[in-house]
């Protein structure tokens, strides 16, 4: 089957072509959808295509974005495969990132030693081993701590030196933003509580060609006794602390939690 919409206009937004096709035979179903703005579009010229296949034992989806010059800004997908053998061979869903050399924000990446998978067990425990980097140290890392047999989840996430200029260039109608974005997060969940720590930084942030500067934010969420939860957060600008916030979440007898937050602006 096929479907398409041409010359769609909503206020000032104009999309030249939106299409969707589906083909099916006895072995698989193929899906293809996308948006195309031609070179005569008054706003942005680009093409975005989603290509998918649903097969007997797995399914696959790939995103392909090209700018008006035909340069590939995004080429990234995922293969999903159910595992139900049990006995150490898996009992959940296995996700594999594709292709071997994906492209994000016009940058080509590679996976270190086939570290490109995420596995979700039927009990919702997430196991991950993703190491995706380019030749200049820009990249992503998601690792689960497999040695932790007590926690329900124990995951580390790192994003290193992502160019916001390149990222905003693959997002049509997105404001012009520049800077280098990095972040680290650690998440631990047990049967009774959770712990989360996040720190993110943008070096030389600009918005629509106006300099904002170096920005760093951080937050920590920690469990306490008797169901209490504690929050600590901060905001720095050009290496100067401009805000500190402390809070706590207190359970009550009525079942409605009480949140108290104290913030200090410098």
Model-derived regions, located:
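Interface amphipathic segments
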Residues: 1-266
């Amino acid at each position: 089957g096929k479907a398409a919409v041409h010359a769609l206009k909503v206020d000032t937004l104009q999309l030249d072509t939106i299409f969707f096709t589906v083909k099916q035979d006895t072995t698989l179903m193929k899906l293809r959808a996308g948006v195309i703005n031609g070179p005569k579009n008054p706003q942005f010229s680009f093409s975005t295509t989603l290509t998918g296949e649903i097969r007997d034992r797995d399914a696959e989806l790939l995103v392909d974005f090209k700018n008006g010059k035909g340069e590939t800004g995004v080429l990234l997908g995922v293969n999903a495969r159910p595992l139900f053998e049990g006995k150490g061979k898996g009992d959940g869903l296995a996700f594999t990132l594709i292709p071997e050399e994906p492209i994000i924000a016009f940058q080509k990446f590679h996976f270190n030693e086939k570290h490109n998978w995420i596995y979700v067990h039927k009990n919702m425990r997430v196991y991950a081993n993703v190491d995706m980097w380019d030749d200049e140290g820009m990249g992503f890392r998601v690792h689960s701590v497999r040695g932790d047999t007590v926690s329900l989840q124990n995951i580390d996430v790192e994003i290193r030196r992502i160019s916001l200029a390149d990222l905003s260039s693959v997002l049509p109608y997105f404001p012009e933003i520049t800077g280098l974005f990095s972040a680290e997060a650690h998440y631990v969940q047990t049967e009774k509580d959770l712990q989360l720590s996040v720190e993110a930084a943008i070096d030389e942030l600009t918005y629509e060609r106006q300099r904002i500067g170096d920005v760093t934010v951080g937050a920590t969420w920690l469990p306490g006794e008797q169901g209490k939860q504690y929050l600590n957060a901060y905001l720095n600008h050009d290496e100067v602390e401009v805000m500190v916030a402390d809070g706590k979440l207190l359970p009550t007898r009525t079942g409605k939690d009480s949140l108290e937050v104290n913030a200090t602006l410098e």
